[in-house]
Amino acid sequence: MFGRPKKSDNTKYYEILGVSKNASQDDLKKAYRKAAIKNHPDKGGDPEKFKELAQAYEVLSDPEKREIYDQYGEDALKEGMGGGGGHDPFDIFQSFFGGSPFGGGGSSRGRRQRRGEDVIHPLKVSLEDLYNGTSKKLSLSRNVICSKCKGKGSKSGASMKCPGCQGSGMKVSIRHLGPSMIQQMQHPCNECKGTGETINDKDRCSQCKGEKVVQEKKVLEVIVEKGMQNAQKITFPGEADEAPDTVTGDIVFVLQQKEHPKFKRKGDDLFVEHTLSLVESLCGFQFILTHLDGRQLLIKSLPGEVVKPDQFKAINDEGMPMYQRPFMKGKLYIHFSVEFPDSLNPEQCKALEGVLPPRTSVQLSDMELDECEETTLHDVNIEEEMRRKQAQEAYDEDEDMHGGAQRVQCAQQ
C-alpha cells in the first residue's frame, strides 16, 4: 500500500501569477497573459520569471493537477502525481496565444516570435489634471485570439499551404519600365493576407470566420499622476491587438496638455502674468490668485517696495508637484507689467514732481536750443511697421525682376 503524500507548499504558484486560491480559469488566463507578455525574453523580460509563470499556469489551468497541488502541494506533482509542469515555457506561451507548439520544426525556443505593433493614443489633459492628478476611463476595441479555435481559424485546427504564394506569405510582381528594364516588387499575398496559409471554407471557425481573431471592447483606466509632463507616455503592456504567433504589443497613451488661459508651465515651475497700475507699482498692491487646485493665494508687495515693469517675483513651493515626489513643488513666478496713464494734466505733473526723485535730464541754454532742430514723436506699433516694410520690400523686388525681364525681351527684338 502506498502512504499518503506528505503535504508541501501549495501557495507558491498562486503567488507567482498574482491571484487568489479561489481564482477562476478566466482569472488565471488574464493573469498569465499579462505577466507572460511583460516577462517574455523577446521583450527584455526575465527568462527565469517567464519559466516560473509557465510552470504555474500549466499546473493551475489543469483541473486535475490543480486539485493535487491544492491538496498536497508542489512536491506531490514532482513525485509524479498527475504529472509535473515540465513543458517548454515558450511552447506554453505560443499555445496560449494561438500558435502551434509542435509544428514548424520543433520547439519554439529556436524560433523568435514577431512582436506586434504598439497602439498609440493621444490623451488630452488640462493643466489642472497634471497638477492635481486624475483618472480617465477609456473604452477601446481591439483584436483578441479567438477562444473557440484558439487562433487557428479552423474547426479541425488544420490549415493548407496557400497556393498563391506557396506558403511564403509574399508575392513578387514584375513591372516593365522600358526596353531591357524591369522593376521587381514584393508585397503581401492577397489570397492569404500574408499568413502563408488558407483554410477550407467548410472548416472555418464559426466564431471568427477563419480570421483567427475577434473584436473585443475593453475599458482601460488611465491614471494621470501629479506632476506628469506634456508628451509623457502611460503604457499598458500587452493590451494592443493580439495575433497568432505574435508577442502582443502595448497600448501607449501620450499626454497632450491643453493650453491654460492663466498659467504657463516650464518644467516644474509655473508662470503667471499680472498687470499693475502705476499707483500699485509705486505705492503697493495686493490681489488674490486662484491656484490650479482652487486655493486662494493672497499676493501682496512689501511696504515701500516699488515693482518695475517686466520684473519677476517668485513664490517657493507653489509651482507644479514633482512627478512621483508629490510633496515637493517647483516655484510660481509672477511676471509684472505696469500700465501707465495715457496723459497727465499740469497739476498732476506738479504734484508728482513734489514726491518723485528730481529730473536727471540736462537743462539746455537758449543758445544750445537755438542750434537744435526740433522733432515730433508719434506713436507706432513696431511689429506692424516691420511687417509693412517687409511686404513693401518683397513687392519692390518682384517688380524689379519682372521689369528686368521685359527690358531684356525688348532688346532681343
Swiss-Prot record:
Intracellular or extracellular location(s): Cell membrane
Superkingdom classification of source: Eukaryota
Record carries keyword Repeat: yes
Tissue expression as described in the entry: Expressed in seedlings in all tissues, but exceedingly high levels in hypocotyledons and roots.
PROSITE patterns referenced in this protein's UniProt entry, alphabetically: DNAJ_1, DNAJ_2, ZF_CR
Induction context: By heat shock; weakly.
PANTHER family, A to Z: DNAJ-LIKE-2, ISOFORM A-RELATED
Protein name: DnaJ protein homolog
Encoding gene (name): DNAJ1
